[in-house]
């Protein structure tokens, strides 16, 4: 029976995301699970345009940008030790982790 655990990580801050990915890779290597990734997924870029003035001057606008960085890690036939270590993993605020079997 071939099982694979897909771990998808999302964050607005790529440094936090990369640190979390390194932690998961270290856990996988120390417990002996086979790992594919981290695979960088496309970055979602959202741009918001807001008027600077509350009344007139529609030509004066300000733009803000929000980027969502994503990574995918695939563990093939994860060991029970790996699953326990991932359950205990403390993820920093700002990083969203999704597990799929």
From Swiss-Prot:
Put simply, this protein is called Small ribosomal subunit protein uS10
Share an example GO biological-process annotation for this protein. translation
One cellular component GO annotation, for this chain's record? Answer: ribosome
Its lineage reads: Bacteria, Bacillati, Mycoplasmatota, Mycoplasmoidales, Mycoplasmoidaceae
Give any Pfam family that matches.
Answer: Ribosomal_S10
What family does this belong to?
Answer: Belongs to the universal ribosomal protein uS10 family.
Which keywords label this protein?
Ribonucleoprotein, Ribosomal protein
Q: HAMAP family from the xrefs?
A: Ribosomal_uS10
Q: How does it assemble?
A: Part of the 30S ribosomal subunit.
State whether keyword Ribonucleoprotein applies. Answer: yes
Give the species this sequence originates from.
Answer: Ureaplasma parvum serovar 3 (strain ATCC 700970)
Q: Which GO terms describe its molecular function?
A: structural constituent of ribosome; tRNA binding
